[in-house]
């Protein structure tokens, strides 16, 4: 089912984005 893999990849993508934003925030503070 392609929808399941899409949402799984999307949540992984969001986690990566959040992690990168967090690293940027740590550097800036």
UniProtKB/Swiss-Prot annotation:
InterPro entries: Glucagon, Glucagon_GIP_secretin_VIP. It is found in: Secreted. It holds the Pfam family Hormone_2. Keywords: Hormone, Secreted. Gene3D superfamilies: 6.10.250.590. Disulfide bonds: none annotated. The keyword DNA-binding does not apply. It comes from the Eukaryota. GO terms for molecular function: glucagon receptor binding; hormone activity. One of its GO terms (biological process) is response to starvation. One of its GO terms (cellular component) is extracellular region. Induction: Produced in the A cells of the islets of Langerhans in response to a drop in blood sugar concentration. Promotes hydrolysis of glycogen and lipids, and raises the blood sugar level. Belongs to the glucagon family. This is Glucagon. The lineage of its organism: Eukaryota, Metazoa, Chordata, Craniata, Vertebrata.
């Amino acid at each position: 089912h392609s929808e399941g893999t899409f949402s799984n990849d999307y949540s992984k993508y969001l986690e990566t984005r959040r992690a990168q934003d967090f690293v940027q925030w740590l550097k800036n503070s």
